[in-house]
Design a protein with these regions (language model features):
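N-terminal secretory signal peptides and thylakoid transit peptides that target proteins
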Residues: 15, 22-49
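NAD(P)+-binding Rossmann beta1-loop-alpha1 motif at the extreme N-terminus of oxidoreductases
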Residues: 41-108
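Conserved N-terminal Rossmann-fold NAD(P) cofactor-binding segment
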Residues: 67-70, 91-131, 135-151
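Internal alpha-helical scaffold of NAD(P)-dependent oxidoreductase catalytic cores
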Residues: 120, 182, 189-196, 214-253, ...
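Redox-cofactor binding/interface segments in oxidoreductases and associated redox assembly factors
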Residues: 133-137, 159-160, 198
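Short, conserved loop/helix-junction motifs that constitute active-site signature segments
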Residues: 148-155, 191, 214
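Rossmann-fold NAD(P)-binding glycine/threonine-rich loop
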Residues: 162-196
């Protein structure tokens, strides 16, 4: 039986097994068949399979067509978080172009998500998208700004999902980001002129599918200074079945990080209460 005729989770698992680490894409670790998978590895596999399940599976995806009013979405980074977010946007009817340094390694993922999903280089994705999701290790943000800053400044919205993480990026780097005002202001400095909103920074990638359209209004804290960009981010987040909650300007972006006060699943009221205690 060919890969295309196998269940979607089998194809995605094979994709995960043969996809190496990618600096921009943050792809899952290579899992050798000769090595017994750890619990963390199995979580990676579950997260990868969810990329197809949140889009309704390949049979559902083939029937999808983008409406004339649907914005084109690009992801810079197509690993766990970028893949999960992009899949939800595909399900909402948006054409999504996933990008990485090695777009050929994304073939199985985009095939499983259906005709609205494409894979490309970062440059092609930036040219394609009306909205860009920035989902990379935070150390790559400055480099992306140098290479693609002009193009990103022309977009309606750049959603900054990237986080500075000490264990990955180094303690000195995180201190440098903090000295620049934290994530958010540091992203704006790296991408001058871009219409930036920080969002999805404190939610586990493997929670996204189960939270979408769930009762109880699971909240997504957002921060930004651009009124139009915030309005657009609000619309997109609602489209994928989550509830955006404004917590302040980009200066509040320093709190929208994994391990920060907004980490986990909260109701809108809880997010507002947490935000009221912060400066």
């Amino acid at each position: 039986m060919s890969d295309m005729r196998k269940p979607s989770n089998v194809r995605i698992s094979r994709w995960l097994q043969r996809t190496p680490v990618d600096t921009f894409g943050m792809c899952p670790l290579l899992i050798s068949p000769s090595i017994k998978p750890s619990r963390r590895d199995l979580l990676f596999l579950a997260g990868g399979a969810a990329l197809v399940s949140v889009a309704g599976g390949p049979h559902h995806a083939r029937a999808q067509t983008a409406g004339a009013d649907k914005l084109k979405i690009a992801t810079i980074g197509a690993g766990r978080e970028g893949g999960a977010l992009g899949a939800l946007l595909v399900k909402a009817g948006h054409p999504v172009m996933f990008s990485s340094r090695h777009p050929e390694q994304l073939k199985d993922m985009v095939t499983g998500l259906g005709p609205l999903a494409k894979a490309s280089t970062v440059a092609e994705a930036v040219a394609f998208g009306d909205v860009v999701l920035l989902v990379v290790p935070y150390t790559a943000v400055a480099e992306i700004g140098k290479e693609h800053g002009t193009g990103l400044a022309q977009k309606k919205l750049v959603i900054d999902v990237s986080n500075p993480i000490a264990r990955r990026d180094g303690e000195d780097f995180v201190k440098q980001v903090d000295a620049e005002g934290g994530a958010g202001l540091a992203t704006q400095k790296a991408l001058p002129g871009a219409h930036i909103v920080r969002a999805f920074n404190a939610i586990n990638f493997d929670q996204l599918a189960e939270l979408a359209h769930r009762q109880g209004e699971p909240a997504v804290p957002i921060a930004g200074d651009d009124k139009d960009a915030l309005a657009l981010a609000t619309t997109l987040i609602k489209e994928i079945g989550l509830e955006p909650v404004m917590v302040g300007g980009l200066a509040m972006g320093k709190y929208l990080v994994w391990g920060g006060p907004f980490t986990g699943v909260h109701t809108p009221a809880q997010v507002k209460e947490i935000a009221s205690t912060l400066k």
